Amino acid sequence: MLIFPLINDTSRKIIHIDMDAFFAAVEERDNPALKGKPVVIGKDPRETGGRGVVSTCNYEARKYGIHSAMSSKEAYERCPKAIFISGNYEKYRTVGDQIRRIFKRYTDVVEPMSIDEAYLDVTNNKLGIKSAVKIAKLIQHDIWKEVGLTCSAGVSYNKFLAKLASDFEKPHGLTLVLKEDALCFLAKLPIEKFHGVGKKSVEKLHDMGIYTGQDLLAVPEMTLIDHFGRFGFDLYRKARGISNSPVKSDRIRKSIGSERTYAKLLYQETDIKAEISKNAKRVAALLQDHKKLGKTIVLKVRYADFTTLTKRVTLPELTRNAAQIEQVAGDIFDSLSENPAGIRLLGVTMTNLEDKVADISLDL
């Protein structure tokens, strides 16, 4: 007997767009000499004493086993000829904005998951195109023609399957999963490829002898709930291609922040205040992008000895004004006890967010 009823809405048309090695691809586009070479977005460990992590890398670098979140030192050891680029996140944000404008030509129901991926519900799209595959192809064409980058697309009747489909054929692939093909598609997938199933859950499933979607499909719902609690209910439905989570065009954000880690420690107050200013301006720009205002400003400081201090101030009025955010964050820093150790990391975050109110004029 099912603990929770099975409800499967197969009427929707969902596209998941995932840019191919986005940051590295932007760098290759802007510097064609990089094409065909292993490119890593991250600090060069030869210049940082081995510190730093890989933000992302291109497909050439991935051939050496390099991946996101790997230490830059290990990436260099795996591929000494890799080209390390610190990255230009303002440039990437600008390109991401271009791509989102392309999405909006087809539908307003867009849920960005990050700067380089998004879900689109094109069931009722602006152009009246019935085929989601056709829309996905048009988006791929528009992005290539106007932005000079490739993306992979997954098309299906829910977000879970669309995400798996976009990962299935990269780079520049397009995969369609119809409702009649979903079980076959899922059956062949390794369980670690299932979106939303983390490393610890994968290890636990392996301990149970579950390695593929086919294996998962054979497990009774109650057994999964006994082992995983409520998540067992989700696993049971994932194995059957069931997910009714809507594409949310306005994802709820609890905070917006910006922080930087410094290869060279900061000691001088002028340098520290300059970095606080940069972070404050970045936060203000992000608030503007997301049409949000905030009340609570948080400053995070990490010293050379890895001591981390976090302090917040709540304002009487909502704001997204860069100068005000900078002033308050600077005042917070001034209120901290002196620490002779250099600063390794600075971050500014705005919380207590609310949607922009039309009659409040608090722009940059």
Curated annotation (Swiss-Prot):
- List the transmembrane segments: none
Which of UniProt's keywords are assigned here? Cytoplasm, DNA damage, DNA repair, DNA replication, DNA-binding, DNA-directed DNA polymerase, Magnesium, Metal-binding, Mutator protein, Nucleotidyltransferase, Transferase
The UniProt entry, under InterPro entries, shows: DNA/RNA_pol_sf, DNA_pol_Y-fam_lit_finger_sf, DNA_pol_Y-fam_little_finger, DNA_polymerase-Y, DNApol_IV, PolY_HhH_motif, Rev_trsase/Diguanyl_cyclase, UmuC
The Gene Ontology terms for molecular function here are: damaged DNA binding; DNA-directed DNA polymerase activity; magnesium ion binding
Gene Ontology CC terms = cytosol
Chief localization class? cytoplasm
Q: Which domain of life is it from?
A: Bacteria
Reply yes or no: does the keyword Nucleotidyltransferase apply. yes
Question: Which family does the UniProt entry place this protein in?
Answer: Belongs to the DNA polymerase type-Y family.
Q: Which reaction equations make up its catalytic activity? A: DNA(n) + a 2'-deoxyribonucleoside 5'-triphosphate = DNA(n+1) + diphosphate
Residue numbers annotated as active site = 117
Comment on bound cofactor: Binds 2 magnesium ions per subunit.
- Record's subcellular location: Cytoplasm
State its Enzyme Commission number(s).
2.7.7.7
The gene name on file is dinB
Cite the CDD domains for this sequence. Answer: PolY_Pol_IV_kappa
List, separated by semicolons, the cofactors it needs. Mg(2+)
Function, as annotated: Poorly processive, error-prone DNA polymerase involved in untargeted mutagenesis. Copies undamaged DNA at stalled replication forks, which arise in vivo from mismatched or misaligned primer ends. These misaligned primers can be extended by PolIV. Exhibits no 3'-5' exonuclease (proofreading) activity. May be involved in translesional synthesis, in conjunction with the beta clamp from PolIII.
Provide the site residues for: Substrate discrimination. 23
Q: How does it assemble?
A: Monomer.
Carries keyword Chaperone? no
Which ranges of the sequence are coiled-coil? none
Annotated positions binding Mg(2+): 18, 116
Provenance organism: Streptococcus pyogenes serotype M6 (strain ATCC BAA-946 / MGAS10394)
What is the protein's given name? DNA polymerase IV
Biological processes per GO annotation: DNA-templated DNA replication; error-prone translesion synthesis; SOS response
Boundaries of each UmuC domain copy? 14-198
